[in-house]
């Protein structure tokens, strides 16, 4: 699997699931952009829109427009392997 670009993870500093997902990206050497929705109002609004006005984190958006919300490690790895 090549390093992916165009992957965006909406997160916060206090989110344990976000830390876990970042470890998956690091372990697989996958590049991604992390945006903290506590500090970026526009990013918060994007996450909110994707989830019917109730944003949950992490929300991970892929280049093809698909996204995962609070994925397990297995779900995230499966998605990354399918890219």
Predicted segment positions?
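Local sequence-structure signature of Cys/Sec-based thiol-disulfide redox active-site neighborhoods
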Residues: 1-28
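Class I S-adenosyl-L-methionine
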Residues: 19-22, 26, 48, 77, ...
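Non-catalytic, surface beta->alpha helical segment in thiol-disulfide oxidoreductase systems
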Residues: 62-83
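Thioredoxin-like thiol-disulfide oxidoreductase module
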Residues: 37-54
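Short alpha-helical
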Residues: 16, 42, 75
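Residue-level detector of anion-binding/catalytic polar loops
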Residues: 31
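Short, structured active-site "lid" loops
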Residues: 49-69
